[in-house]
Protein backbone atom coordinates (compact mmCIF):
# COMPACT_ATOMS: atom_id res chain seq x y z
CA UNK A 1 0.00 0.00 0.00
CA UNK A 2 1.01 3.59 -0.52
CA UNK A 3 -0.30 6.47 1.59
CA UNK A 4 -0.30 9.90 -0.04
CA UNK A 5 -1.10 13.43 1.11
CA UNK A 6 -3.61 15.79 -0.44
CA UNK A 7 -0.78 18.03 -1.64
CA UNK A 8 0.49 15.28 -3.99
CA UNK A 9 -2.32 15.70 -6.52
CA UNK A 10 -1.80 15.74 -10.27
CA UNK A 11 -2.98 19.30 -10.81
CA UNK A 12 -1.72 19.71 -14.37
CA UNK A 13 0.27 22.82 -13.53
CA UNK A 14 -2.85 24.68 -12.36
CA UNK A 15 -3.35 26.24 -8.95
CA UNK A 16 -5.94 24.20 -7.09
CA UNK A 17 -6.53 25.29 -3.52
CA UNK A 18 -6.97 22.73 -0.76
CA UNK A 19 -10.74 23.30 -0.60
CA UNK A 20 -11.06 22.62 -4.35
CA UNK A 21 -9.38 19.21 -4.68
CA UNK A 22 -11.36 16.45 -6.40
CA UNK A 23 -10.94 12.75 -7.21
CA UNK A 24 -9.92 13.67 -10.78
CA UNK A 25 -6.73 15.22 -9.40
CA UNK A 26 -5.72 11.81 -8.08
CA UNK A 27 -6.93 9.61 -10.94
CA UNK A 28 -3.36 9.21 -12.23
CA UNK A 29 -2.39 7.81 -8.82
CA UNK A 30 -5.32 5.39 -8.97
CA UNK A 31 -4.36 4.31 -12.50
CA UNK A 32 -0.76 3.82 -11.38
CA UNK A 33 -1.93 1.73 -8.42
CA UNK A 34 -4.05 -0.46 -10.69
CA UNK A 35 -1.12 -1.01 -13.06
CA UNK A 36 1.23 -1.93 -10.21
CA UNK A 37 -1.17 -4.04 -8.11
CA UNK A 38 -1.07 -1.48 -5.29
CA UNK A 39 -3.66 -0.11 -2.89
CA UNK A 40 -3.85 3.52 -1.79
CA UNK A 41 -4.49 5.36 1.46
CA UNK A 42 -4.96 9.11 1.85
CA UNK A 43 -4.28 11.99 4.22
CA UNK A 44 -5.84 15.43 4.41
CA UNK A 45 -3.13 18.12 4.64
CA UNK A 46 -3.66 21.11 6.92
CA UNK A 47 -0.06 22.32 7.19
CA UNK A 48 2.10 24.52 4.92
CA UNK A 49 -0.72 26.77 3.72
CA UNK A 50 -1.50 30.49 4.17
CA UNK A 51 -4.54 29.53 6.27
CA UNK A 52 -2.68 27.02 8.44
CA UNK A 53 -1.54 29.35 11.21
CA UNK A 54 -1.51 27.83 14.69
CA UNK A 55 -4.99 26.34 14.24
CA UNK A 56 -6.99 24.90 11.37
CA UNK A 57 -10.06 22.85 12.32
CA UNK A 58 -9.98 24.41 15.80
CA UNK A 59 -9.48 28.01 14.67
CA UNK A 60 -11.54 30.73 16.33
CA UNK A 61 -12.14 32.12 12.84
CA UNK A 62 -15.18 30.36 11.35
CA UNK A 63 -14.02 31.09 7.80
CA UNK A 64 -10.73 29.30 8.48
CA UNK A 65 -12.53 26.36 10.09
CA UNK A 66 -14.94 26.12 7.17
CA UNK A 67 -12.05 26.11 4.70
CA UNK A 68 -10.39 23.15 6.42
CA UNK A 69 -13.68 21.34 6.98
CA UNK A 70 -14.33 21.53 3.24
CA UNK A 71 -10.78 20.37 2.51
CA UNK A 72 -11.13 17.36 4.80
CA UNK A 73 -14.56 16.40 3.45
CA UNK A 74 -13.09 16.48 -0.06
CA UNK A 75 -10.09 14.45 1.10
CA UNK A 76 -12.38 11.74 2.46
CA UNK A 77 -14.30 11.69 -0.84
CA UNK A 78 -11.02 11.22 -2.70
CA UNK A 79 -10.13 8.34 -0.38
CA UNK A 80 -13.60 6.91 -0.98
CA UNK A 81 -13.04 6.97 -4.74
CA UNK A 82 -9.65 5.31 -4.31
CA UNK A 83 -11.22 2.56 -2.25
CA UNK A 84 -14.06 2.11 -4.74
CA UNK A 85 -11.88 1.86 -7.84
CA UNK A 86 -9.25 -0.33 -6.20
CA UNK A 87 -11.87 -2.52 -4.50
CA UNK A 88 -10.19 -2.13 -1.13
CA UNK A 89 -11.13 0.35 1.57
CA UNK A 90 -8.70 3.26 1.81
CA UNK A 91 -7.56 4.50 5.20
CA UNK A 92 -8.06 8.24 5.57
CA UNK A 93 -5.90 9.64 8.33
CA UNK A 94 -6.66 13.02 9.87
CA UNK A 95 -3.77 14.73 11.62
CA UNK A 96 -3.72 18.47 12.26
CA UNK A 97 -0.96 20.62 13.73
CA UNK A 98 -3.29 22.77 15.86
CA UNK A 99 -1.88 24.01 19.13
CA UNK A 100 -0.13 26.80 20.99
CA UNK A 101 3.53 27.65 21.54
CA UNK A 102 2.89 29.10 24.99
CA UNK A 103 0.27 28.76 27.69
CA UNK A 104 -3.37 29.01 26.65
CA UNK A 105 -6.39 29.73 28.82
CA UNK A 106 -8.97 28.40 26.34
CA UNK A 107 -8.19 24.68 25.97
CA UNK A 108 -11.84 23.73 26.29
CA UNK A 109 -12.86 26.19 23.58
CA UNK A 110 -10.33 24.92 21.04
CA UNK A 111 -11.23 21.30 21.68
CA UNK A 112 -14.94 22.09 21.46
CA UNK A 113 -14.35 23.75 18.10
CA UNK A 114 -12.34 20.76 16.90
CA UNK A 115 -15.06 18.34 17.96
CA UNK A 116 -17.67 20.40 16.12
CA UNK A 117 -15.51 20.44 12.99
CA UNK A 118 -14.99 16.68 13.15
CA UNK A 119 -18.71 16.09 13.57
CA UNK A 120 -19.37 18.06 10.38
CA UNK A 121 -16.62 16.22 8.51
CA UNK A 122 -17.77 12.73 9.47
CA UNK A 123 -21.43 13.53 8.78
CA UNK A 124 -20.58 12.71 5.15
CA UNK A 125 -20.64 8.93 4.82
CA UNK A 126 -17.86 7.31 2.79
CA UNK A 127 -18.45 3.54 2.54
CA UNK A 128 -15.04 2.79 1.00
CA UNK A 129 -13.05 4.57 3.71
CA UNK A 130 -11.58 3.54 7.05
CA UNK A 131 -11.42 6.79 9.03
CA UNK A 132 -8.66 7.49 11.54
CA UNK A 133 -7.74 10.42 13.79
CA UNK A 134 -4.14 10.95 14.91
CA UNK A 135 -2.90 12.49 18.13
CA UNK A 136 0.46 14.03 18.99
CA UNK A 137 2.09 15.06 22.24
CA UNK A 138 3.46 18.32 20.83
CA UNK A 139 4.86 19.87 17.69
CA UNK A 140 7.78 22.19 17.03
CA UNK A 141 6.54 25.71 17.70
CA UNK A 142 3.49 24.30 19.49
CA UNK A 143 5.18 22.99 22.60
CA UNK A 144 2.68 24.01 25.28
CA UNK A 145 -0.64 22.76 23.95
CA UNK A 146 -1.87 20.34 21.30
CA UNK A 147 -5.60 20.46 20.60
CA UNK A 148 -5.74 16.90 19.24
CA UNK A 149 -4.23 15.13 22.24
CA UNK A 150 -4.27 11.36 22.75
CA UNK A 151 -7.13 11.60 25.21
CA UNK A 152 -9.18 13.79 22.86
CA UNK A 153 -8.85 11.51 19.85
CA UNK A 154 -9.12 8.32 21.87
CA UNK A 155 -12.44 9.55 23.24
CA UNK A 156 -13.63 10.67 19.81
CA UNK A 157 -12.64 7.39 18.16
CA UNK A 158 -14.33 5.27 20.82
CA UNK A 159 -17.51 7.35 20.76
CA UNK A 160 -17.79 7.35 16.97
CA UNK A 161 -16.52 3.88 16.12
CA UNK A 162 -13.56 4.99 14.02
CA UNK A 163 -9.85 4.27 14.27
CA UNK A 164 -7.33 6.01 16.47
CA UNK A 165 -3.91 6.40 14.87
CA UNK A 166 -0.95 5.50 17.07
CA UNK A 167 2.31 7.02 15.83
CA UNK A 168 5.41 5.73 17.61
CA UNK A 169 6.92 9.23 17.53
CA UNK A 170 3.91 11.09 18.88
CA UNK A 171 4.20 10.16 22.54
CA UNK A 172 6.58 10.93 25.39
CA UNK A 173 9.95 9.19 24.87
CA UNK A 174 9.35 7.00 27.93
CA UNK A 175 5.89 5.95 26.69
CA UNK A 176 5.75 2.80 24.56
CA UNK A 177 3.16 2.47 21.80
CA UNK A 178 2.93 -1.32 22.03
CA UNK A 179 1.32 -1.09 25.46
CA UNK A 180 -1.63 0.81 23.95
CA UNK A 181 -2.60 -1.87 21.41
CA UNK A 182 -4.57 -4.24 23.63
CA UNK A 183 -6.22 -1.37 25.51
CA UNK A 184 -7.42 0.38 22.36
CA UNK A 185 -8.65 -2.77 20.61
CA UNK A 186 -11.07 -3.47 23.43
CA UNK A 187 -12.92 -0.26 22.56
CA UNK A 188 -12.26 0.53 18.88
CA UNK A 189 -12.82 -1.74 15.86
CA UNK A 190 -9.35 -1.24 14.38
CA UNK A 191 -6.17 0.77 14.83
CA UNK A 192 -4.03 2.64 12.33
CA UNK A 193 -0.36 2.37 13.22
CA UNK A 194 2.56 4.55 12.15
CA UNK A 195 5.80 2.65 12.68
CA UNK A 196 8.62 5.13 13.19
CA UNK A 197 11.85 5.64 15.12
CA UNK A 198 11.77 8.77 17.26
CA UNK A 199 15.20 9.89 18.49
CA UNK A 200 14.45 12.09 21.53
CA UNK A 201 11.48 13.57 19.65
CA UNK A 202 9.31 12.88 16.57
CA UNK A 203 12.35 12.77 14.30
CA UNK A 204 11.04 10.00 11.99
CA UNK A 205 14.42 8.27 11.71
CA UNK A 206 14.56 5.15 9.53
CA UNK A 207 12.91 2.21 11.27
CA UNK A 208 15.33 -0.43 12.55
CA UNK A 209 14.85 -3.72 14.35
CA UNK A 210 14.94 -2.27 17.85
CA UNK A 211 13.11 -3.30 21.01
CA UNK A 212 10.18 -0.94 20.42
CA UNK A 213 9.42 -2.35 16.97
CA UNK A 214 9.89 -5.94 18.11
CA UNK A 215 7.60 -5.53 21.10
CA UNK A 216 5.03 -3.75 18.94
CA UNK A 217 4.95 -6.69 16.53
CA UNK A 218 4.77 -9.16 19.41
CA UNK A 219 1.82 -7.36 20.96
CA UNK A 220 -0.11 -7.36 17.68
CA UNK A 221 0.62 -11.00 16.85
CA UNK A 222 0.11 -12.31 20.37
CA UNK A 223 -3.20 -10.43 20.65
CA UNK A 224 -4.31 -12.09 17.39
CA UNK A 225 -4.83 -8.60 16.01
CA UNK A 226 -3.17 -8.72 12.59
CA UNK A 227 -6.58 -8.25 10.97
CA UNK A 228 -7.40 -5.30 13.26
CA UNK A 229 -4.23 -3.22 12.99
CA UNK A 230 -3.44 -1.29 9.81
CA UNK A 231 0.35 -1.07 9.77
CA UNK A 232 1.92 1.93 8.07
CA UNK A 233 5.57 2.99 7.94
CA UNK A 234 6.24 6.64 8.76
CA UNK A 235 9.85 7.76 8.37
CA UNK A 236 12.01 9.86 6.08
CA UNK A 237 15.73 9.07 5.98
CA UNK A 238 16.50 12.07 3.78
CA UNK A 239 20.16 12.03 4.83
CA UNK A 240 20.79 8.63 3.21
CA UNK A 241 19.85 6.90 -0.03
CA UNK A 242 16.05 7.07 -0.12
CA UNK A 243 15.56 3.60 -1.62
CA UNK A 244 17.98 2.20 0.96
CA UNK A 245 15.94 3.87 3.69
CA UNK A 246 12.74 2.30 2.34
CA UNK A 247 14.30 -1.15 2.25
CA UNK A 248 15.92 -0.98 5.68
CA UNK A 249 12.71 0.17 7.35
CA UNK A 250 10.45 -2.23 5.47
CA UNK A 251 12.67 -5.23 6.15
CA UNK A 252 13.10 -4.31 9.80
CA UNK A 253 9.33 -4.25 10.22
CA UNK A 254 8.88 -7.53 8.36
CA UNK A 255 11.56 -9.14 10.52
CA UNK A 256 9.88 -7.95 13.71
CA UNK A 257 6.59 -9.56 12.70
CA UNK A 258 8.35 -12.73 11.55
CA UNK A 259 10.05 -13.05 14.93
CA UNK A 260 6.71 -12.61 16.67
CA UNK A 261 5.04 -15.21 14.45
CA UNK A 262 7.85 -17.72 15.08
CA UNK A 263 8.06 -17.14 18.83
CA UNK A 264 7.17 -20.04 21.19
CA UNK A 265 4.13 -18.19 22.50
CA UNK A 266 2.27 -21.31 23.71
CA UNK A 267 5.17 -22.32 25.93
CA UNK A 268 5.61 -18.74 27.13
CA UNK A 269 1.95 -18.56 28.10
CA UNK A 270 2.17 -21.89 29.88
CA UNK A 271 5.08 -20.59 31.94
CA UNK A 272 3.21 -17.38 32.75
CA UNK A 273 -0.07 -19.04 33.71
CA UNK A 274 1.75 -21.42 36.06
CA UNK A 275 3.80 -18.66 37.71
CA UNK A 276 7.16 -19.84 36.31
CA UNK A 277 8.53 -16.39 35.62
CA UNK A 278 12.23 -17.30 35.50
CA UNK A 279 11.43 -19.78 32.75
CA UNK A 280 9.33 -17.22 30.90
CA UNK A 281 12.14 -14.65 30.89
CA UNK A 282 14.72 -17.27 29.92
CA UNK A 283 12.70 -18.40 26.91
CA UNK A 284 12.00 -14.81 25.87
CA UNK A 285 15.76 -14.22 25.83
CA UNK A 286 16.55 -17.45 23.99
CA UNK A 287 13.95 -16.71 21.34
CA UNK A 288 15.94 -13.62 20.32
CA UNK A 289 18.76 -15.79 18.96
CA UNK A 290 16.64 -18.47 17.32
CA UNK A 291 17.40 -18.88 13.57
CA UNK A 292 14.61 -16.62 12.36
CA UNK A 293 17.06 -14.85 10.01
CA UNK A 294 17.37 -18.02 7.94
CA UNK A 295 13.60 -18.08 7.57
CA UNK A 296 13.63 -14.45 6.42
CA UNK A 297 16.37 -15.13 3.88
CA UNK A 298 14.32 -18.03 2.52
CA UNK A 299 11.28 -15.74 2.30
CA UNK A 300 13.34 -13.26 0.26
CA UNK A 301 14.65 -15.95 -2.09
CA UNK A 302 11.16 -17.37 -2.62
CA UNK A 303 10.05 -13.89 -3.69
CA UNK A 304 13.06 -13.24 -5.97
CA UNK A 305 14.39 -10.54 -3.64
CA UNK A 306 18.00 -10.17 -2.46
CA UNK A 307 18.66 -12.03 0.78
CA UNK A 308 20.67 -10.75 3.76
CA UNK A 309 22.88 -7.80 2.84
CA UNK A 310 22.80 -8.51 -0.92
CA UNK A 311 20.34 -5.64 -1.42
CA UNK A 312 23.15 -3.16 -0.71
CA UNK A 313 24.87 -3.90 -4.02
CA UNK A 314 21.54 -3.88 -5.86
CA UNK A 315 20.69 -0.41 -4.54
CA UNK A 316 24.20 0.89 -5.25
CA UNK A 317 23.89 -0.28 -8.84
CA UNK A 318 20.48 1.39 -9.21
CA UNK A 319 21.87 4.61 -7.76
CA UNK A 320 24.74 4.55 -10.24
CA UNK A 321 22.64 3.70 -13.29
CA UNK A 322 19.37 5.52 -12.58
CA UNK A 323 19.05 7.98 -9.69
CA UNK A 324 22.44 9.65 -10.20
CA UNK A 325 21.37 10.62 -13.73
CA UNK A 326 18.12 12.32 -12.79
Predicted regions and their residues:
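Residues that line or immediately flank small-molecule/substrate-binding pockets and catalytic motifs
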Residues: 6, 96, 197
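Catalytic domains of carbohydrate-active enzymes, especially glycoside hydrolases
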Residues: 1-7, 32
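N-terminal, charged low-complexity regulatory/assembly segments
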Residues: 9-11
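Catalytic domains of carbohydrate-active enzymes that cleave complex glycans
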Residues: 315, 321-326
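Active-site acidic/histidine proton-transfer and metal-coordination neighborhood
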Residues: 19-164, 267, 283-285
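N-terminal "assembly arms/tails" that initiate or stabilize quaternary assembly
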Residues: 14-15
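Active-site capping/gating regions of soluble enzymes
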Residues: 1, 106-318
